[in-house]
Each structure stands twice: as structure tokens, then as C-alpha cells.
């Protein structure tokens, strides 16, 4: 990425990550350019796939989704077809905020958000345990979010 964008692009991205609704004129003032080149740079970064979209950031706490659990998942089959089946099925569970395939002592790490432990237990029993090829799971309840970043460091 360092060859694709310069310091001005990084400043633009930094400002957009902080406030995607910033008017282009204000953004231009902050980065020291006029409106037209800033708009062109944004369009170019969208076209090259650096900016993939703009979305509202919701407060899970305000929505009552205060319970976060990380779940280790071990599969009984890790051939490609089994992985594809698991991937497709886990994408259908809205409570799963993040899912990563892991190299290590287990196969996947899920971040699951729910209202409380009772709801999590239901999600585990009815949805996660029923995913294709699941052999075992281990749950870790988060007690406090110490760092939560919504964008990569530039």
C-alpha cells in the first residue's frame, strides 16, 4: 500500500476514518488542498479498492448488546469442502461479528455479541454447535474492552 498512496492520501484516509461524513470542502481545508483534487483522490482510492464503503458505526452498548464472547472452534474435518461449508454457514449467523480461520491449536476464532449470557447460551446451543463439522468449542467471555479500533493504522 505504501507505493499506492502518498502522505496526503494518508491524511485524507485518516480524516475519513474519523468522520466519513466530513464535507469535502472541510476535508480539503484540513489536508491543505482545494476541493477538486481531494474529491479526485477519494474517487481514485475508491476505484483502487482502498476505500470499500461508508457506513454508520452503531454503539453495541446503546443497543443492549453488552455481552461479548470469543469462541474457539475445532472442526472434525478440515478438507477444503468442509471449510467452505463451515464458512458459508457461519456467515448466516448475525450474532457472529467476526470469524477468523486460525493456524494453531484450533481452527476458527469467532467474536459473538449478545444481550446477556442466557442469550449467548441459546446462540451456542442452537446455532454455533449446529455448524457443519464442529467437533468442539471453547468460550471466553470478555470482561472489558480495553482497545477497540475500527480502522487500521495508517
Swiss-Prot record:
Keyword Transcription in annotation: yes
Residue ranges constituting the HTH asnC-type domain according to the UniProt record: 5-66
SUPFAM superfamilies found in the cross-reference section: Dimeric alpha+beta barrel, Winged helix' DNA-binding domain
Organism: Rhodobacter capsulatus
One of the record's GO molecular function terms: sequence-specific DNA binding
Listed PROSITE patterns: HTH_ASNC_1, HTH_ASNC_2
Lineage, opening ranks: Bacteria, Pseudomonadati, Pseudomonadota, Alphaproteobacteria, Rhodobacterales
Cysteines paired by S-S bonds: none
Keywords on record: Activator, DNA-binding, Transcription, Transcription regulation
Function of the molecule: Transcriptional activator of the putA gene in response to proline.
Annotated protein name in UniProt: Proline dehydrogenase transcriptional activator
Gene Ontology BP term (one): response to amino acid
Ranges annotated as DNA-binding: 24-43
GO cellular component terms given for this protein: cytosol
SMART domains membership: HTH_ASNC
Pfam families: AsnC_trans_reg, HTH_AsnC-type
